[in-house]
A protein has these predicted regions:
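Membrane-proximal helix-turn-helix segments that form the acceptor-binding/catalytic region
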Residues: 88-107, 210-213
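Glycosyltransferase donor-sugar binding loop
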Residues: 190-208
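Nucleotide-activated donor-binding/catalytic signature segment of Leloir-type glycosyltransferases, i.e.
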Residues: 205-229
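Aromatic "clamp/platform" in nucleotide-sugar-dependent glycosyltransferases that forms part
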Residues: 246
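Short hydrophobic beta-strand element within catalytic cores of glycosyltransferases
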Residues: 259-266
């Protein structure tokens, strides 16, 4: 079966969507006996077009000759707090996204919470499948203590401090303001934010956050956008991942932290419950976040329990299990839409 993977995610650095794209493509490429994969091929001679981003050039390539699969990494209702766009333009963009999703034959969601949102925009439930993100254990894994000490020197991170890591684009929805406030309230800990402005000046809150970065508390370090191949080092030098986002999808950063067996603290959002099984630290305010971090720092039993929860999540989203999931999915939907004479069934 020939699959054309279409995506522009890797053209913008520092996006979780790009990480998810690379993990999924690499996984399918390993199944050489079943699938022949190309990326952004201009040819139309494929059985499946698997579209990862909503670019117009990919939408226009959807047709009746092949199966069109749309990978949904966000829904319009969750598209607030990332980019600062005029209200009319934002409305037009959301309508465009809805029509693009409806044009696809099949939809894949990375979070089951999206399913009801997609049904609201008249996408049939029978054409929606939930397949979670995953992170390869070969790329993100615990390192030896001696290596971690050397890495802390490399990144100028104190060896004897409790290290709190935040990751992602600096924008309103990521809760960056709360991250900074929690850092101010805990001067005995060191806070690191790895990430920057992937979309430049159109990032929501760009001017405010540029100014904030110039006046960070003394116990906070900002690392600009880091290539993903070095992010395993960053996760290993930290003690806990802290993600105070107001809106999320299925964060690759959480899966990466889990692979390194680090506890993680998040805002108490409903969308985490079905995918993380409530095996995580949570809070809803600067005070609650601070209390959780203090407990993780001072209570070794609690810390180890939370680290075990991360191991559980890491093992659950297993590459080998998901390899079978993807193989079964492609075969199932292709057989669903095509008859024996290769004529596409219009449903």
């Amino acid at each position: 079966m020939r699959i054309n993977m279409l995506s522009s995610a890797e053209s913008v650095k520092g996006q979780g969507v790009a990480s998810a794209f690379r993990e999924q493509v690499t996984l399918i490429e390993e199944m050489k006996d079943d699938f022949e994969v190309e990326i952004n091929s201009k040819s139309s001679k494929f059985d499946i077009f698997h579209i990862h981003t909503v670019d117009p050039k990919y939408r226009f390539r959807m047709n009746k000759k092949h199966l069109n699969i749309m990978y949904v990494h966000f829904v319009p209702s969750k598209n607030d707090g990332s980019l600062k766009l005029p209200r009319l333009f934002n409305w037009i963009f959301n309508k465009y996204v809805e029509k693009t999703y409806r044009k696809a034959d099949e939809i894949i969601v990375v979070n089951p919470c999206f399913i009801s949102e997609l049904e609201k925009i008249k996408i049939k439930r029978e054409n929606i499948t939930y397949i979670p993100n995953f992170v390869d254990h070969d790329n993100f894994k615990p390192l030896h203590k001696e290596i971690i000490e050397e890495l802390k020197k490399k990144y100028n991170v104190p060896i004897d401090k409790f290290i709190v890591l935040g990751c992602g684009q600096i924008q309103t929805r990521k809760g960056f303001d709360d991250f900074v406030e929690v850092a101010k309230n805990n001067p005995d800990m060191t806070f690191i934010w790895a990430g920057g402005f992937s979309f430049g000046r159109i990032t929501d809150g760009y001017k405010k956050y540029k100014k904030l970065l110039e006046n960070l508390p003394q116990n906070m370090i900002h690392l600009p956008i880091i290539e993903r191949k070095y992010m395993n080092e960053i996760f290993n030098i930290c003690d806990v991942l802290f993600m105070p986002s107001f809106i999320e999808l299925f964060p690759m950063t959480i899966l990466e932290a889990c692979n390194v067996h680090k506890p993680f603290l998040v805002r108490d959002l409903d969308l985490y419950k079905p995918i993380l099984f409530e095996r995580y630290c949570r809070g809803n305010s600067v005070e609650e976040f601070s209390n959780e971090l203090i407990k993780l720092k001072n209570d070794i039993t609690y810390y180890n329990q939370c680290a075990e929860n991360s191991k559980f999540i890491s093992n659950f989203y297993n590459k080998d299990i998901l390899k079978k999931t993807w193989k079964d999915y492609y075969l199932r939907v292709y057989n669903k839409w095509f008859t024996n004479n290769n004529s596409k069934n219009i449903k």
